[in-house]
C-alpha cells in the first residue's frame, strides 16, 4: 500500500514563542529536534541572548527602552518593550491556530512581556497556552514575588497555563548531579508539553486526535498539566499512566480535572491494556469530565515499550498538589547517581547555552 503524504497545509499551524533568556534557551533546545508543523520565534530585550538561540525568526523588543541590554529584574521594562514592538509581534503571531508561550518567570523580559504577547495571541483567535517556570528558592524572595505577580497577570490572558517550579528538580537529583543536567531536566518538561501536543495534533495516528479535540480540553481552561510516562513489561499501560500523572517535576495532580486528553503510543498496542489505561485515567478525574482519547504508533520507542501522555485541565479551583510525587517520575523511577535518564528521543546537551541559569550565577560566570 502506498504511503500517504499529508501536505503541510492540512496540519494545525503551531507557533512556539520563547520570551526572555529562559524562554529562548528552551525553544533553542526544542529546535534541535524535528517538530512537524511547528514554527519557533525568539523574543528578547537582550541582543546577545537573542542571537545565541540559533532560532531563525528573532524579534528584538525594547530597542528604545533597554538599548539591547536586557531588562534586569524589572518586569515594567519587559512590558514596555513588548508594547513598543506590538505591531511586529502581531505580525509574527498571525496565522497560527495554536500558540505556546514559554518563559522563566522572575526576571524582567519574560515576566513583563509574556502577558502582553499572550493578549495579542488571544486577540488573533489562536488557542494560547503558556508553559513557564518559577524561580528557585535560593534566588531570593524578591524574584519569587516578581514571578508570582507575573503569573497572576499572565493567567488572565491565556487559555491555559502550565507551571513548573524549578525547586521540584530537587525531587529527582542527588548531590552529585551536574548543574547542566539539572536544568535540562526542567527544560525537558517544557519541551515534552509542546512536542507532545504538536505530535498529537499533527502526526496521523491509529485513533486520531485533531486540533478541535485539543481546543475542547484547553480553551479557557486555566491551570493545566501535561504528563508523559513510559513503561514496559507486565501492566505497562497502567504503570505508564501512574508515571505520567505523578511526575515529581509537576506541581499538581490531575485529580478532579474536568477536561482530559490522553494518548497511548506504542508499536504493539493491545485493546485490553488501552482499556486499562482509560479506566485508570477516568477514575481520578471529575465524573463528568470530557475525556478525549487517541492512539498512535512511534517506531522510536524501544521494543515492548509504551508511552502515555495525559493533558488535564479545568480544575475549577479544586487543585490537588503532588506533595508525595517522589515515587514516580517521567524521567526515571529511580534516579541513578550522577546521571539523569531521559526518553530515548531526547539527547541531553551540556552546553551552557541550554540552561536557564539564575542571574547571580550568570554574573559570576562573567
Set out the residue ranges of the language-model regions:
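Tubulin/FtsZ superfamily GTPase core signature
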Residues: 1-366
Amino acid at each position: 500500500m502506498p504511503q500517504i503524504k499529508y501536505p503541510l497545509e492540512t496540519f494545525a499551524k503551531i507557533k512556539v514563542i520563547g520570551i526572555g533568556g529562559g524562554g529562548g534557551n528552551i525553544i533553542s533546545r526544542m529546535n534541535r529536534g524535528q517538530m512537524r508543523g511547528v514554527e519557533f520565534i525568539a523574543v528578547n530585550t537582550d541582543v546577545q541572548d537573542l542571537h545565541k538561540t540559533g532560532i531563525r525568526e528573532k524579534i528584538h523588543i525594547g530597542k528604545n527602552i533597554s538599548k539591547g541590554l536586557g531588562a534586569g529584574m524589572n518586569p515594567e521594562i519587559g512590558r514596555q518593550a513588548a508594547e513598543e514592538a506590538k505591531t511586529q509581534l502581531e505580525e509574527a503571531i498571525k496565522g497560527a491556530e495554536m500558540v505556546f508561550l514559554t518563559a522563566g518567570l522572575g526576571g524582567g523580559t519574560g515576566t513583563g512581556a509574556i502577558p502582553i504577547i499572550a493578549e495579542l495571541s488571544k486577540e488573533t483567535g489562536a488557542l494560547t497556552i503558556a508553559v513557564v517556570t518559577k524561580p528557585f528558592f535560593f534566588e531570593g524572595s524578591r524574584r519569587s514575588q516578581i514571578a508570582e505577580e507575573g503569573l497572576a497577570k499572565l493567567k488572565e490572558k491565556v487559555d491555559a497555563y502550565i507551571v513548573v517550579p524549578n525547586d521540584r528538580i530537587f525531587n529527582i537529583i542527588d548531590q552529585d548531579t551536574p548543574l547542566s543536567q539539572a536544568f535540562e531536566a526542567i527544560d525537558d518538561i517544557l519541551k515534552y508539553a509542546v512536542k507532545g501536543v504538536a505530535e498529537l495534533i499533527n502526526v496521523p495516528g491509529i485513533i486520531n486526535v485533531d486540533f478541535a479535540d485539543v481546543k475542547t480540553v484547553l480553551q479557557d481552561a486555566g491551570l493545566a498539566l501535561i504528563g508523559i510516562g513510559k513503561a514496559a513489561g507486565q501492566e505497562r499501560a497502567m504503570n505508564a499512566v501512574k508515571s505520567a500523572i505523578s511526575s515529581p517535576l509537576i506541581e499538581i495532580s490531575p485529580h478532579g480535572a474536568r477536561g482530559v486528553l490522553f494518548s497511548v503510543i506504542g508499536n504493539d498496542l493491545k485493546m485490553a491494556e488501552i482499556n486499562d489505561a482509560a479506566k485508570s485515567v477516568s477514575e481520578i478525574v471529575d465524573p463528568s469530565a470530557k475525556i478525549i482519547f487517541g492512539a498512535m504508533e512511534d517506531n522510536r520507542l524501544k521494543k515492548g515499550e509504551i508511552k502515555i501522555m495525559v493533558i488535564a485541565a479545568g480544575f475549577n479551583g479544586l487543585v490537588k498538589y503532588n506533595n508525595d510525587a517522589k515515587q514516580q517520575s517521567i524521567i526515571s523511577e529511580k534516579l541513578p547517581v550522577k546521571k539523569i535518564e531521559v526518553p530515548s528521543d531526547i539527547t541531553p546537551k551540556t552546553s551552557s547555552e541550554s540552561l536557564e541559569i539564575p542571574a547571580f550565577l550568570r554574573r559570576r560566570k562573567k
